[in-house]
Amino acid sequence: MNPTRGAVGGTDPRPAAVVLLSGGLDSATVLAIANQQGFACHALSFRYGQRHEVELAAARRVASALGVVRHVVVDIDLGVFGGSALTDPTIAVPAAGTAEEIPVTYVPARNTIFLSFGLALAETAGAWDVFIGASSVDYSGYPDCRPEYLAAYQAMANLATKATVSGERTLSVHAPLMHLSKADTIRLGLSLGVDYGLTHSCYDPGPDGRPCGRCDSCSLRERGFTEVGVPDPAGG
Amino acid sequence: MNPTRGAVGGTDPRPAAVVLLSGGLDSATVLAIANQQGFACHALSFRYGQRHEVELAAARRVASALGVVRHVVVDIDLGVFGGSALTDPTIAVPAAGTAEEIPVTYVPARNTIFLSFGLALAETAGAWDVFIGASSVDYSGYPDCRPEYLAAYQAMANLATKATVSGERTLSVHAPLMHLSKADTIRLGLSLGVDYGLTHSCYDPGPDGRPCGRCDSCSLRERGFTEVGVPDPAGG
């Protein structure tokens, strides 16, 4: 409705925050939360060689619908390292529940890389708050979604930048979904007016961008909407 | 001389290490140290919108001369954030000693971003050791070159990846130059056979790639060679 509420370095009186925005259900909810908390949000998305680039179109729709100060898309090539079904076309995306403990959809150091760009953006935007949609409930078992990881990241970040070492303020990494089930996340997002029809969760969409309905991410999403008792407006 | 000592996933019996290689004097020395310690080195360089892209040519020369298992160059666009004289053509590179406490050549979260890609490469290469040329002596005052920062990074990294959370082993971030002056670094590198004529340090080279002779990096390099009492083979 109001995609640009303020200009970079402009007169927006709200404190700036960086929100990692994938275009999925979780990060859309996090953006709504940060907005509701009164932050002027700088959304940050990545084109990282993922199979599901349809995510980025969803991120743009979500950023526009919920309102952000700006939306930065950074190109990074995680594919050069290989090792993940999300970036390596030779590795198949498994069906939900069939994977090993940490599944092949895990991308090495992904959240660490994403948060590090978030840290850079926070410094240049004058933001002291970085939001990420990590959750340790109903998640895929990725190590970089756990609270102890994020606490260690925040400790490191506060030693890392010109802004944080000034001692003036400390940077906070917020994961407001950390202890919410997928259903709780959906309930919260609906209460904040998130249109989940704009979001995309599937790891392995068809050529038309439609969700596969069988990967971990589709499965978690479907279970969430079923538990809430509302249909998934994205038709997942 | 022997640019490819082993193949990825091949029969190289040496443990793998990741070495961040900028093409400068420090990282060339670090690569020589890691080689001498018996590691099979995976060199990692970045094309990050820096003014001094001649660095990358130097990184390729150094990797080839000292010998690496492979040399990965990752494209990342730090320029989208602005805020540094190294990536923003509208900010002048200052002469040495004229800058504020943390100079405008500081790139927001640069080492955090570089190490995070290093962490990803370490995981896919099966490496437990990441080397970086950071030093807290004769340096430009960047917060992400200090030992407390690197210790916090290592703590975070050990919670971040599938490999590190297995509990099998811990990942180490090595900064073997941390407590060395530039002159000590040069002495060590010379004793290991580093050809500093292949390296490039200047933040603001001319169109022909020649060092400016006046930036912080040129100045530190010149003082180092003067202290050692040998000419800079790069003619800096």
Swiss-Prot record, chains A, B:
EC numbers: 6.3.4.20
GO molecular function, one term: ligase activity, forming carbon-nitrogen bonds
Pathway(s) served: Purine metabolism; 7-cyano-7-deazaguanine biosynthesis
Binding site for Zn(2+): C202, C212, C215, C218
Any single biological process term in GO: queuosine biosynthetic process
InterPro entries, alphabetized: QueC (IPR018317), Rossmann-like_a/b/a_fold (IPR014729)
Residues annotated to bind ATP: L21, S22, G23, G24, L25, D26, S27, A28, T29, V30, L31
Entry keyword set: ATP-binding, Ligase, Metal-binding, Nucleotide-binding, Queuosine biosynthesis, Zinc
UniProt entry tagged with the keyword Zinc: yes
Cofactor: Zn(2+)
Claim: Ribonucleoprotein is one of the keywords in the record: no
Co-factor binding comment: Binds 1 zinc ion per subunit.
SUPFAM superfamilies referenced in this protein's UniProt entry, alphabetically: Adenine nucleotide alpha hydrolases-like
Catalyzed chemical reaction(s): 7-carboxy-7-deazaguanine + NH4(+) + ATP = 7-cyano-7-deazaguanine + ADP + phosphate + H2O + H(+)
Family per similarity comment: Belongs to the QueC family.
Record's function text: Catalyzes the ATP-dependent conversion of 7-carboxy-7-deazaguanine (CDG) to 7-cyano-7-deazaguanine (preQ(0)).
Alphabetized PANTHER family for the sequence: 7-CYANO-7-DEAZAGUANINE SYNTHASE (PTHR42914:SF1)
UniProt-recorded name of the protein: 7-cyano-7-deazaguanine synthase
